[in-house]
């Protein structure tokens, strides 16, 4: 049996990945709080507990690259939650999941009421690359919902329309929740979507 050697580079590589992940996490928080224009690199470095210069080490493209990757990370994380929820809780339960995700932000971190993906979307037309990352993320949330509706016998056109309605309604409710400092708009939005889902499924039977 050969000897397995752990090289000095492996711990450094792990530390590098951890540092990069912390910066992305900080960028996601700041996008939600302040939007892209208000996201300062010094604040990202502070959130990530990293020297400001390390941002350019991990993200040579600077603020834009960091924001794009933070947007994609948010999209990927929520997309994975949606897919898992659809498997475990079904369509109605997944509508509730949207409310739960953002309700926690309103309650636990009022200063972070917002969605990094929505903040990135507002960058168009000044930054089409960032807006494209937001569009990609929104689509990754809509597609599994539409697929689940297709599995229930809903037509493709109606499934895609309803999936888009879910994302648009929740994002709009999040803006209202931020203005009100309350979860009520989210609760109302999720309740309304649940009723619309019931009507849609009933119409296919």
Describe each region flagged by the PLM.
Residues 1-18, 203-205:
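N-terminal intrinsically disordered/low-complexity leader segments
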Residues 22, 26-69:
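Helix-turn-helix
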Residues 71-77:
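Short, basic, alpha-helical segments at the C-terminal edge of helix-turn-helix-like DNA-binding modules
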Residues 79, 112, 127-152, 161-164, ...:
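Amphipathic alpha-helical packing segments from all-alpha helical-bundle domains
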Residues 82-114, 162-166:
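Hydrophobic alpha-helical connector segments
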Residues 105, 123-126, 167-184, 197-205:
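Amphipathic C-terminal alpha-helical segment
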